[in-house]
Swiss-Prot record:
Annotated InterPro entries: ConA-like_dom_sf, Intracellular_Lectin-GPT, Lectin_leg
Molecular function GO terms recorded: D-mannose binding
Pfam families (alphabetical): Lectin_leg-like
Residues with attached carbohydrate: 75
The protein, known as: Protein ERGIC-53-like
Domain (L-type lectin-like) ranges: 31-252
Membrane topology: Single-pass type I membrane protein
TM segment ranges: 463-483
Gene this protein is translated from: LMAN1L
BP-aspect Gene Ontology terms: endoplasmic reticulum to Golgi vesicle-mediated transport
Secretion signal, residue range per the UniProt entry: 1-25
Disulfide bonds: 176-215
GO cellular component: collagen-containing extracellular matrix; COPII-coated ER to Golgi transport vesicle; endoplasmic reticulum membrane; endoplasmic reticulum-Golgi intermediate compartment; endoplasmic reticulum-Golgi intermediate compartment membrane; Golgi membrane
Length: 526
């Protein structure tokens, strides 16, 4: 048997020990879309409101399909930052971007940030000059033609400010060379932080659905929750259009352990146990149905019917209570009105006046004839009013009897579900009628009247006085008209004869107007 020597066995043993703990060989994590940390088109930005849950800064221009961080102008910078912090410890970000410009040399580039604090616009690719977190830089500076364009992952603790991505203030974790300028289609960058490792893959952008290619894998890297996502861009002496079409964020979590399939006997046992519980529940309710086991659909239908029956009975009980209360109120109102009006043809207890069957007033006790005459004139109106009130009382009595009959029928029969609102409307209408009838009764009760004296006559104007004043006004009007006509005739006669009366002429503006309009005759002296 040949002997094994050298470092080969030790290296294989180390690989065997590390393989179970490798995150790549385990189950993929569960992804959950986080809409408050994402944006995409169409209708990416709301008119006048910006991007939901995001803020834009600098020279960023919001559109319906994309966010243009910097236009193709020199010395411009713009950024977008999430308003909400990241509450989870593992995440994945998919960013779709496009960088276009003239020539082979590009502007400064773009950056994707995950930092402890929200930034606005800074000197490092439009982002923060001093940050606590990581930044993925898409560099395309015109000065570095050898290593440009490139993608770099930098980390910083926020203590030393940085002016450029490679000035030494930040720690470079990894990089790869990737030409992302002037692609036929927008390129996608997938950044995954899982198991304290940061991985990034990109597609070429030559076709809309290119597969992703590996770029950077750094770790161990500790990124605490509570940070903010951001994307920034900047231009220098040369200008490019830096566009972000979508920014999708997913939270990652451990997959839940799969439930092993239960054996057939255990499933049957659980099903029988559920049926037994249902039977005991039905027996406890006191139902008379057959206790033979039924299918799940039939049991569910029976439970729904039982629930509907209980709900219907409860509604019927409430309807009966409302009808009883309404009947009591109607009876009380009827007693009050009968007490106030009394039956037809019977004298009232106060001796005010007596009514016959036709609600007329044959006699009225009083001490003067003029009071009897005024009351006899208004007796027809008062009788009509009392007759209308008596008719209304009879109608209310009929409605109360109908309500009592409906309550008696509801006790022995089931009403269809959904008619409760009709009784509520009836109760409301009868309540309004009762309130309207209580108003005159309260007014009559509050008005004090000595016993034996009829109600006071109306305080309105007497017809005789009204006719007297009308006659005086008519006579005066006709007298005035006759006087004006006579005056006009006398003036016309004077003008026709050419001689004026010796007496003083009356001062009337209309007569003078007629005099001015008449031409002077030739025989009148000047």
């Amino acid at each position: 048997m040949p002997a094994v020597s050298g470092p080969g066995p030790l290296f294989c043993l180390l690989l065997l020990l590390l393989d179970p703990h490798s995150p790549e060989t385990g189950c993929p994590p569960l992804r959950r879309f986080e809409y408050k940390l994402s944006f995409k088109g169409p209708r990416l930005a709301l008119p006048g409101a910006g991007i939901p849950f995001w803020s834009h800064h600098g020279d960023a221009i919001l559109g319906l399909e994309e966010v243009r961080l910097t236009p193709s102008m020199r010395n411009r910078s713009g950024a977008v930052w999430s308003r909400a912090s990241v509450p989870f410890s593992a995440w994945e970000v998919e960013v779709q971007m496009r960088v276009t410009g003239l020539g082979r040399r590009g502007a400064q580039g773009m950056a994707v940030w995950y930092t402890r604090g929200r930034g606005h616009v800074g000197s490092v690719l439009g982002g923060l000059a001093s940050w606590d977190g990581i930044g993925i830089f898409f560099d395309s500076p015109a000065e570095d033609t050898q290593d440009s364009p490139a993608i770099r992952v930098l980390a910083s603790d926020g203590h030393i400010p940085s002016e450029q991505p490679g000035d030494g203030a930040s720690q470079g974790l990894g990089s790869c060379h990737w030409d992302f300028r002037n692609r036929p289609h927008p390129f996608r960058a997938r950044i995954t932080y899982w198991g304290q490792r940061l991985r990034m893959s990109l597609n070429s952008g030559l076709t809309p659905s290119d597969p992703g290619e590996f770029c950077v894998d750094v770790g161990p890297l500790l990124l605490v929750p509570g940070g903010f996502f951001g994307v920034s861009a900047a231009t220098g002496t040369l200008a490019d259009d830096h566009d972000v079409l979508s920014f999708l964020t997913f939270s990652l979590s451990e997959p839940s352990p799969e439930v092993p399939p239960q054996p057939f006997l255990e499933m049957q046992q659980l099903r029988l146990a559920r049926q037994l519980e249902g039977l005991w529940a039905r027996l406890g309710l006191g139902t008379r149905e057959d206790v033979t086991p039924k299918s799940d659909s039939e049991a569910q239908g029976e439970g729904e019917r039982l629930f509907d029956l209980e709900e219907t009975l409860g509604r019927h009980r409430r309807i009966l209570q409302a009808l009883r209360g309404l009947s009591k109120q109607l009876a009380q109102a009827e007693r009050q009105w009968k007490k106030q009006l009394g039956p037809p043809g019977q004298a009232r207890p106060d001796g005010g006046w007596a009514l016959d069957a036709s609600c007329q007033i044959p006699s009225t006790p009083g001490r003067g004839g003029h009071l009897s005459m005024s009351l006899n004139k208004d007796s027809a109106k008062v009788g009509a009013l009392l007759h209308g009130q008596w008719t209304l009382l009879q109608a209310l009595q009929e409605m109360r009897d109908a309500a009592v009959r409906m309550a008696a029928e509801a006790q022995v029969s089931y009403l269809p579900v959904g008619i409760e609102h009709h009784f509520l409307e009836l109760d409301h209408i009868l309540g309004l009628l009762q309130e309207e009838l209580r108003g005159p009764a309260k007014a009559a009760a509050k008005a004090p009247r000595p016993p034996g004296q009829p109600p006071r006559a109306s305080s309105c104007l007497q017809p005789g006085i009204f006719l007297f004043y009308l006659l005086i006004q008519t006579v005066g009007f006709f007298g005035y008209v006759h006087f004006r006509q006579e005056l006009n005739k006398s003036l016309q006669e004077c003008l026709s004869t050419g001689s004026l009366p010796l007496g003083p002429a009356p001062h009337t503006p209309r007569a003078l107007g007629i005099l001015r309009r008449q031409p002077l005759p030739a025989s009148m002296p000047a």
